[in-house]
């Protein structure tokens, strides 16, 4: 699995879990004209996203049928803060046997290793990203 896939070659995205991180990703992708489908279990959040003209649906990302709903997407970004739900969502997507590019949020190095073993293409640990950004700002 490669972590260096050109974004230009990917046109359809699913964002599973749309808190502040997922929302920022969705807005950036939308601004670039990408086709984005957002799945979140918070009905209020989904309504707010729809009010912003984003394609959002209410569902629990850990449910098996979500993998079916997003089966046609090139890229799956699993951005929930619920790490167990993220692991379950990744399992369901990979069990379908597709070749979707999966980016997932982790909370620590152990979780990152577990997600990598599940077949994730890229693991992001927000704490590490923030630390790296802070250190770069000091340079």
Describe each region flagged by the PLM.
Residues 1-139:
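Cytosolic regulatory regions of ion transport systems
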